[in-house]
């Protein structure tokens, strides 16, 4: 085991604080509508340009091990906030740095760090409750568009596109963001269920121009196992021919002889048919087949259920208004399943999501839920260069996450105003222990940090903005950094999702209060000749 270096007390907190400040300085420049971009070097390809706080935080690794501990703790705040709320990472970083900075000062003059932590926890809890109480529900499409616009740094086109997508697929529907092959950003809404399996043979294609299979009002055979026996299939194939309707086969696989026969029948024009493989793997494959069965009012043909293929009749098959099959995707549009059955299936999946502890299982269940609940919308991001597309994609991802959070918990005035106004929850909140009361004051001061930073990034003195807003009585009044005017934030459409604001403060308070209580730090002794062994590396030149 290698020898360790140990630092204590004020030295430990100072080193932690230097690391926190370095990370904070790199991240905070991106905050607000006039926030700047950060250029990140990549080991391959061109550098990346981003205004996404968590992307910046994830790139930061410091040479000094003790400073790096501080930076990594705050980086964890940004990552956790991003995971839970999908946005607000820069706000969380600024809040955490402010709380730790003020706390470290008070500990250095003799206050008890554990009592300060208690005070911070009390203050944060009071503010979280206040923000939740002040949140207003998002109902209209225009409100959803406002949230998306703010999160996309004032890009109204992005906000409106997200609102349109949510209108089409519902609040629980899947909205994905991918890179387009053109310079335009566009929304493509897939009504119905889409899964990532395409046609088994290009000979099934009915639209040669678009290279896809288009089946109108087809029957859908949902089979759990491989189809290897042509004899067993004959009764259902004959019934399909007599009905005059197309037939879609969804099964684990179709063996060579059977597939060849289906293709020959398709080419001769006797049978409009197509076959695709079942989506998913393992147990999920069976669950997805059951989802398709519910959506199309069909039965899953499984020998486990005592249903043999040769005994299958047309009334056991699913139905849909239209099916589109491309090389890699199958889309079932307007299945015949009744709403009550689909809703019962949705409720069942929601219950499974609540029960599962695995993040992977949860993600897969949510995908199934979204497919059943409302279909899929795809936002294809275009741009003149690859760098522009990636930067825009970051912003749209943020906007999409923020919009989902707004629908979930409602909205509050944006631009740091909600946190500033929530200071009212701390009025009269004190404790018999002076150090606990000082901890509450740390939170009171930190609530001003985001709005100060937004103003600073716009080239305006933050303390003047805060002073003017504190003097005003209108709870919705705030500073519009884009126009550098004081406006009613709700009416101006400058809003934040309550969930994003609450998550940012909760995570920042949690990590920062723990950093304050650090009394010793342990790390490997740096090798001789490394920058750490001669001092603090590049940090000294930055004036800390």
Swiss-Prot record:
Stated role: Together with its co-chaperonin GroES, plays an essential role in assisting protein folding. The GroEL-GroES system forms a nano-cage that allows encapsulation of the non-native substrate proteins and provides a physical environment optimized to promote and accelerate protein folding.
Key word Isomerase present: yes
SUPFAM superfamilies to which the protein is assigned, alphabetical: GroEL apical domain-like, GroEL equatorial domain-like, GroEL-intermediate domain like
Name listed for the protein in its UniProt record: Chaperonin GroEL 3
PANTHER family: 60 KDA HEAT SHOCK PROTEIN, MITOCHONDRIAL (PTHR45633)
PROSITE patterns: CHAPERONINS_CPN60 (PS00296)
GO molecular function, one term: unfolded protein binding
Taxonomy, superkingdom: Bacteria
Subcellular localization, as worded in the UniProt entry: Cytoplasm
């Amino acid at each position: 085991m290698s020898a360790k270096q140990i630092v204590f007390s004020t030295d430990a907190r100072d080193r932690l604080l230097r690391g926190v400040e370095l990370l904070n300085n790199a991240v905070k420049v991106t905050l607000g509508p006039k926030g700047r971009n950060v250029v990140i070097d990549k080991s391959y390809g061109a550098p990346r340009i981003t205004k996404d706080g968590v992307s910046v935080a994830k790139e930061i690794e410091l040479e000094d091990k003790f400073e790096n501990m501080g930076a990594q703790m705050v980086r964890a705040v940004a990552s956790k906030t991003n995971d839970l709320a999908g946005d607000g990472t820069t706000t969380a970083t600024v809040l955490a740095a402010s709380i730790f900075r003020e706390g470290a000062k008070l500990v250095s003059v003799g206050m008890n760090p554990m009592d300060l932590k208690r005070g911070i926890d009390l203050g944060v809890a009071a503010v979280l409750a206040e923000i939740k109480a002040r949140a207003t529900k998002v109902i209209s499409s225009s409100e959803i568009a406002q949230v998306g616009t703010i999160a996309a740094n004032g890009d109204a086109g992005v906000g409106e596109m997200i609102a349109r997508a949510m209108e089409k697929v519902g609040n629980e529907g899947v909205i994905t963001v991918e890179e387009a092959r053109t310079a335009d950003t566009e929304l493509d809404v897939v009504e119905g269920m889409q899964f990532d399996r395409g046609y088994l043979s290009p000979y099934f294609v009915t639209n040669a121009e678009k290279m896809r299979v288009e089946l109108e009002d087809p029957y859908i055979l949902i089979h759990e196992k491989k189809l290897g026996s042509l004899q067993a299939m004959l009764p259902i194939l004959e019934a399909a021919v007599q009905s005059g309707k197309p037939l879609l086969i969804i099964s684990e696989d179709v063996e060579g002889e059977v597939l060849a026969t289906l293709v020959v029948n398709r080419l001769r024009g006797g049978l409009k048919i197509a076959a695709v493989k079942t989506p998913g793997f393992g147990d999920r494959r069976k669950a997805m087949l059951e989802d398709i069965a519910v959506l199309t009012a069909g039965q899953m043909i499984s020998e486990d259920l005592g249903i043999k293929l040769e005994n299958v009749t047309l009334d056991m098959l699913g139905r849909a208004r239209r099916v589109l099959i491309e090389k890699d995707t199958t889309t079932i549009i307007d299945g015949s399943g009744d709403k009550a059955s689909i809703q019962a299936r949705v409720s069942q999946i929601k219950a499974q999501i609540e029960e599962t502890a695995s993040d992977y299982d949860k993600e897969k269940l949510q995908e199934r839920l979204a497919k059943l609940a409302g279909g899929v919308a795809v936002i294809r991001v275009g741009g003149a260069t690859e760098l522009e597309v990636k930067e825009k994609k970051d912003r749209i991802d943020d906007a999409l996450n923020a919009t989902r959070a707004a629908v979930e918990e409602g909205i509050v005035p944006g631009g740091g105003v909600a946190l500033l106004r929530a200071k009212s929850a701390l009025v009269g909140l004190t404790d018999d222990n002076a150090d606990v009361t000082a901890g509450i004051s740390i939170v009171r001061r930190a609530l001003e940090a985001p709005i100060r930073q937004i103003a600073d990034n716009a080239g305006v003195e933050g303390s003047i903005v805060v002073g003017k807003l504190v003097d005003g009585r209108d709870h919705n009044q705030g500073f519009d950094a884009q126009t550098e005017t004081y406006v009613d934030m709700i009416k101006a459409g400058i809003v934040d999702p309550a969930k994003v604001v609450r998550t940012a403060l909760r995570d920042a308070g949690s990590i920062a209060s723990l950093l304050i209580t650090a009394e010793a730090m342990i790390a490997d002794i740096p090798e001789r000749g490394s920058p750490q062994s001669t001092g603090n590396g590049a940090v000294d030149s930055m004036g800390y």
